[in-house]
Amino acid sequence: MTPEHLPTEQYEAQLAEKVARLQSMMAPFSGLVPEVFRSPVSHYRMRAEFRLWHDGDDLYHIMFDQQTKSRIRVDTFPAASQLINTLMKAMIAGVRDNHALRHKLFQIDYLTTLSNQAVVSLLYHKKLDEEWREAATALRDALRAQGLNVHLIGRATKTKIELDQDYIDERLPVAGKEIIYRQVENSFTQPNAAMNIQMLEWALEVTKDSKGDLLELYCGNGNFSLALARNFNRVLATEIAKPSVAAAQYNIAANHIDNVQIIRMAAEEFTQAMNGVREFNRLQGIDLKRYQCETIFVDPPRSGLDSETEKMVQAYPRILYISCNPETLCKNLETLSQTHTVSRLALFDQFPYTHHMECGVLLTAR
């Protein structure tokens, strides 16, 4: 695979290899055959980052070969959304001959939605001034005149200039309901929107007969919290990143959801609060004992759950675990399988044509 060519004819084979690999990894914990959710074979990534290469008068996006570290020119990127591909050409055309926009520009980041909105961030090794703002405003207006719903941001050391806003609003159809998700530039969002819809619908399906409340750790912008709210009396969710918490609060209001409470704290801190080890001002006014959480949802970083959180989640009758790294999932399962059994297993092909896998398990208490 190269950035400008996807081996779409190999999609089925690479997916089958992942299914076999996941089943083998999970064999010590479950004999289940994974439920498999396929990705679109192209134009599935909703965000992308590129370095810029200045070659005389020419200017173009580049990526680096993971093995050799050599530069690869990228004029089209079929893994990314159609909108990103359109913007890549338009941005180069708009920046190449404009000194204020081109000088010391070293990276462009693209974030797009299925609803055809985009935020484009230009990163510089220089101070950004009024001349830059005027040039960027003219470029933004020219892009909009082409029918592109785009917002531009300039970034430099300790500087961020938003011409109007640093977010876009995604609208995802999830099990018969449209959910609005505010996505903030430079904050985590699910890269594969089509796969995200399938993950949300799978999570809804496996929790459809739930009782009581849901506790969620690592909730981000409320991606899963908002979708799962319809299956539970209440949802209590934690997240540490301020922009993600702000986006989650907006999303709760925008979707008219009244049973989700977001707390800004790390999963490790929440574990301490639940165990009575520490008290936190951020929890004032929230009576944790009022929540009857029979299900806990975790979508941890690649490192998986730390040992204290492992112990904490074992106290819940049901654990829904989404993992972007099956190796750390299996490491966690060495502990979790002492008290719980794997009752559902799914593979989500979030990252086609790579060795990376995303998977989900539902664990029920023995």
UniProtKB/Swiss-Prot annotation:
Q: What GO terms describe the biological role, i.e. biological process, of this protein?
A: tRNA methylation
Q: Which reaction does it catalyse?
A: uridine(54) in tRNA + S-adenosyl-L-methionine = 5-methyluridine(54) in tRNA + S-adenosyl-L-homocysteine + H(+); uridine(341) in tmRNA + S-adenosyl-L-methionine = 5-methyluridine(341) in tmRNA + S-adenosyl-L-homocysteine + H(+)
Please indicate if the UniProt record lists DNA-binding as a keyword.
no
Q: Which domain of life is it from?
A: Bacteria
Q: Where does S-adenosyl-L-methionine bind?
A: Q190, Y218, N223, E239, D299
Active site positions: C324 (nucleophile), E358 (proton acceptor)
Q: Which family does it belong to?
A: Belongs to the class I-like SAM-binding methyltransferase superfamily. RNA M5U methyltransferase family. TrmA subfamily.
Instruction: Return the protein name.
Output: tRNA/tmRNA (uracil-C(5))-methyltransferase
Show the taxonomic lineage.
Bacteria, Pseudomonadati, Pseudomonadota, Gammaproteobacteria, Enterobacterales
Identify the gene encoding this protein.
trmA
